[in-house]
């Protein structure tokens, strides 16, 4: 409800001395509506959009640093949701879905702290998928696993997951 009122105020009184604060508070209100990572993140995307617009419009504002911190927090929540979705697919043995979700995660969140684990899980998913496959396609799927292992080794030669990946 507060988000609506701040949005309305900012729209109607855009020349007011409080318009800047109203725009920030609109984004902040959306941020407060953002649920835990396991739920739909539509409010998080909306908050990121509004707060990014705020930063673009008022980069020198006293609220700009807070807005940046909130955006970073919301992005971490979205990253975690995507990563946990991939792990859930793996847990229920939906290996192809887990692989696709991990590929999307790697592409969409290149600077994530979870990248290394995502690369490792790609190997694990390829391996588990190959083992669960019929014999006629197993060799191709194990080759995919080897390819992913090599890519992992190139990117993370000193990984904490290296011992497990070699198995």
In which residue ranges do the predicted regions lie?
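Acidic, polar-rich low-complexity tracts and alpha-helical solenoid repeat scaffolds
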Residues: 1-167
């Amino acid at each position: 409800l507060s988000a609506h009122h701040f949005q309305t105020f900012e729209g109607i009184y855009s020349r007011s001395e409080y318009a800047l604060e109203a725009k920030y508070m609109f984004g902040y209100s959306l941020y407060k509506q953002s649920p835990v990572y396991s739920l739909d993140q539509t409010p998080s995307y909306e908050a990121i959009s509004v707060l990014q617009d705020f930063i673009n419009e008022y980069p020198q504002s006293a609220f700009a640093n807070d807005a940046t911190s909130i955006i970073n927090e919301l992005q971490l929540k979205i990253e975690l949701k995507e990563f946990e979705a991939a792990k859930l697919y793996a847990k229920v043995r939906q290996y192809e879905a887990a692989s696709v979700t991990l590929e999307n995660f790697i592409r969409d969140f290149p600077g994530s702290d979870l990248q290394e684990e995502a690369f490792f899980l790609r190997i694990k998913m390829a391996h588990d998928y190959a083992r669960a496959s019929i014999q006629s396609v197993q060799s191709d799927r194990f080759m995919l696993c080897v390819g992913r292992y090599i890519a992992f080794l190139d990117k993370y030669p000193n990984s904490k997951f290296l011992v497990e990946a070699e198995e």
